[in-house]
């Protein structure tokens, strides 16, 4: 397997040069209105719309859209992106950018550049096709965009499968395209109609997959085109929702011609007119493209870094932010979404605020939360409240938006309360939902979805440490807003919990913290059956501050001995070899996969943050590089990981060693952002400003970070000189705190 491609010079795009890869190289394009398309390096992919109530309309699945060209003189048909026809094109490249995907190739002297983007507004995607004739004779080409759709997501019977059909696909002159209209009452006025339109003359069209595709009607074999036929210009009232256009163009030698197409969903033809208005001119299309890029660029510019590691620069400046935004649209779960928002606080505080509101609206009056809201999962996971507290405090530090605490948000089970009340109810739930050791109950599971202890009184050391961290954060917040008595109460509770954890959760023989208790037995201790140590109690002991000074090096040593591997940090060690119903799903997973003894990147991300919190940037950097895709220990040839996004896990099972799990959908993205900006560079959020305490890797002698906050640009320059100092706009500081400013620009110079 060859090298699949390379980053652009500024890191905002990845150029794929290998047509066939271990897994499809996907890009994700989306907008605030809920439109989302996931594109492969072939220009194919899935598209969907998520509505405000979280219902999702699946427009089409992977394999549901294609672009074909046919040389009308030779009859040759091909796909410029290779798939779905497996076309033998030359000079193939795919540029996955932040906001677009462009596929380029050449076939028999005809080069094609095929760009897809999602405008900043509207439920639509735009395809731009540029064709250049490199031959010395004129040619005539048919350009055929084709979509085989689902348009499903509503609840109720699928009316289009009934004898009385409930939709029709027609060609509408005023749209210059095909229009799919549903009369299904279950759509409830939501945009389940669709339109596919062209910028220029449409010579033929089709609304019938049976007339265009050979059985079983896949886009792999466009029967009509391959047999010299044109599209049948038919109306369809049966079969699968389908739309195709055929536009014929004559191109002289050396000439380039352009066509634009738009695919979108709507409620009616009036809305369809607005969707296709983007095609009024090439200038209009490019204006929409620039608007989309400008919105993305604004997000990118709010936090920018420059370090000696280009790959880390690319990830922090572009790909982590993009990944977290995508995950917020793709996932709907308390823990997951709050951690994505955690990583976006500096670059998109308004998104973090909206996510907090949404999560709180799925919190019960007693303080606990649902696991996810789409689909709704009310299974009792114990860690929900701690993410609400940690992320809200993080947001308040950065924004100083204390009025947010007074805002009222509904509870999931009725009634409403202020944001502050929601925080306090979450803390109260964790403080009172305790087991025999006065530790937090594990309930069905905590952060580790697969650790399902069957004892109703089972306790989670992880959640208990998380509660300790929350108590610290709440104490600082209460002090900041003048509620000193509550601040003192939370401080006292923190100290009491710290003592409880250190008395009950320390494994004297192994010299590390255990994972929990169930049926009177220790989980994750030296005497435990199956797995004897877990990563999270060691890392969260540091993150929460509960580890005592004399135990810090001991847990570091234990982690190095059992948890740290060439691939990253194991969730647990050793992996459970046999199924243990009392332990749960984790023991049913094959050893060395997912949560059972694999390298779970989220757990490694906790580890690197714990390392930088201890001031050990070098150790954190070493571990971070392991979970970065295409690393020295897991190069692309081994892992198959997408080079521009983090993955969920790496297998340690000998049969699939180093292979990856799912790309994009991992909570480790927010924690990597935090590690680099607040750890390596040391620019930590605080009430009223930043604390600056860098912990750069040993071979980083200089780094920069630019942060835009409320109209002020903060420029941090960190240099390794052997002398510690901080100057703000040339004035030497006696402390490491940099206050927020209303100036246009603040320059902070740090030496270490």
What are these regions (language model features)?
Residues 1-335, 350-358, 362, 394-398, ...:
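Anionic coordination/interaction segments
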Residues 369-387, 412-414, 437-460, 510-534, ...:
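Carbohydrate-binding/catalytic loop surfaces
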Residues 302-305, 309-318, 322-337, 359-386, ...:
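Aromatic-lined, polymer-binding surfaces characteristic
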Residues 68, 344-440, 460-468, 597-620, ...:
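Aromatic-rich carbohydrate-recognition surfaces in CAZymes
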Residues 118-123, 253, 330-336, 348-351, ...:
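Secondary-structure capping and boundary motifs in well-ordered enzyme cores
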Residues 120-147, 189-190, 199-209, 252, ...:
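Beta-rich accessory regions
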Residues 269-270, 398-411, 473-489, 614:
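Inter-helical turn/loop segments and adjacent helix faces that build the functional surface
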Residues 144-146, 161, 370, 466-583, ...:
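Catalytic cores of carbohydrate-active enzymes
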């Amino acid at each position: 397997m060859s090298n699949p491609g390379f980053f652009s010079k500024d890191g905002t795009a990845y150029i794929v040069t290998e047509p066939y890869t271990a897994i499809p190289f996907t890009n994700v394009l989306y907008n605030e209105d809920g439109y989302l398309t996931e594109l492969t390096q072939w220009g194919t992919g899935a598209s969907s719309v998520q509505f405000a109530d979280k219902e999702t309309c699946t427009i089409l699945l992977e394999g549901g859209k294609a672009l074909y060209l046919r040389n009308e003189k030779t009859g040759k048909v091909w796909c410029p992106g290779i798939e779905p026809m497996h076309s033998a094109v030359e000079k193939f490249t795919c540029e996955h950018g932040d906001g677009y995907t462009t596929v380029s190739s050449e076939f028999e002297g005809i080069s094609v550049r095929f760009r897809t983007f999602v405008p900043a507004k509207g439920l639509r995607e735009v395809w731009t096709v540029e064709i250049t004739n490199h031959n010395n004779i004129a040619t005539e080409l048919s350009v055929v965009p084709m979509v085989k759709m689902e348009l499903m997501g509503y609840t109720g019977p699928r009316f289009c499968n009934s004898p009385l059909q409930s939709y029709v696909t027609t060609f509408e002159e005023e749209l210059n395209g095909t229009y799919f209209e549903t009369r299904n009452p279950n759509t409830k006025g939501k945009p389940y109609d669709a339109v596919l339109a062209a910028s220029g003359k449409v010579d033929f069209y089709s609304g019938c997959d049976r007339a265009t595709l050979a059985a079983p009607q896949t886009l792999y074999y466009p029967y009509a085109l391959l047999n010299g036929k044109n599209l049948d210009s038919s109306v369809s009232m049966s079969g699968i929702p389908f739309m195709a256009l055929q536009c014929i163009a004559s191109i002289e030698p050396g000439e380039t011609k352009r066509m634009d197409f738009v695919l979108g969903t709507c409620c009616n033809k009036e809305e369809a007119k607005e969707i296709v208005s983007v095609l009024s001119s090439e200038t209009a299309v490019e204006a929409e493209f620039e608007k989309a890029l400008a919105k993305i660029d604004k997000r990118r510019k709010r936090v920018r870094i420059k370090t000696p590691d280009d790959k880390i620069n690319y990830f922090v400046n572009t790909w982590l932010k993009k990944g977290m935004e995508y995950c917020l649209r793709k996932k709907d779960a308390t823990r997951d979404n709050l951690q994505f928002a955690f990583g976006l606080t500096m670059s998109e505080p308004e998104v973090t605020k909206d996510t907090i509101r949404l999560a709180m609206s799925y919190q019960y009056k007693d303080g606990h939360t649902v696991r996810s809201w789409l689909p709704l999962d009310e299974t009792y996971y114990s860690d929900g409240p701690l993410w609400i507290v940690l992320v809200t405090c993080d947001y308040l530090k950065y924004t100083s938006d204390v009025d947010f605490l007074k805002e009222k948000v509904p509870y999931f089970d009725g009634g409403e309360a202020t944001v502050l009340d929601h925080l306090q109810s979450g803390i109260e739930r964790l403080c009172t939902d305790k087991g025999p050791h006065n530790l937090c109950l594990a309930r069905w599971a905590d952060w580790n979805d697969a650790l399902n202890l069957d004892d109703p009184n089972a306790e989670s050391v992880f959640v208990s440490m998380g509660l300790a961290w929350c108590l610290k954060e709440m104490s600082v917040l209460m002090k900041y807003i003048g509620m000193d008595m509550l601040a003192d109460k939370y401080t006292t509770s923190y100290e009491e919990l710290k003592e409880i954890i250190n008395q009950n959760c320390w494994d004297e023989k192994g010299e590390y913290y255990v994972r929990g208790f169930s049926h009177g037995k220790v989980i994750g201790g030296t005497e435990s059956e199956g797995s004897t140590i877990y990563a999270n109690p060691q890392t969260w002991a540091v993150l929460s501050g509960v580890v005592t000074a004399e135990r810090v090096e001991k847990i570091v040593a234990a982690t190095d001995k059992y948890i740290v591997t060439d691939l990253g940090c194991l969730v647990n060690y050793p992996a459970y070899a046999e199924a243990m119903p009392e332990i749960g799903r984790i023991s049913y997973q094959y050893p060395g996969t997912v949560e059972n003894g694999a390298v779970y990147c989220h757990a490694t991300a906790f580890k690197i943050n714990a390392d930088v919190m201890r001031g050990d940037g070098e150790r954190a950097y070493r571990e971070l590089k392991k979970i970065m895709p295409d690393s020295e220990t897991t190069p692309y040839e081994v892992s198959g990981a997408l080079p521009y996004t983090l993955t969920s896990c790496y297998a340690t099972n000998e049969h699939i060693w180093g292979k990856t799990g799912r790309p994009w959908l991992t909570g480790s993205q927010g924690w990597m952002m935090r590690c680099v900006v607040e750890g390596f560079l040391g620019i930590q959020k605080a009430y009223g400003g930043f604390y600056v305490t860098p912990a750069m890797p040993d071979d980083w002698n200089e780094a920069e970070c630019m942060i835009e906050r409320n109209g002020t640009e903060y420029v941090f320059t960190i240099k390794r000189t052997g002398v510690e100092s901080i100057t703000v706009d040339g004035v030497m500081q006696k402390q490491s705190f940099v206050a927020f400013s209303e100036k246009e620009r603040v320059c902070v110079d740090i030496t270490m």
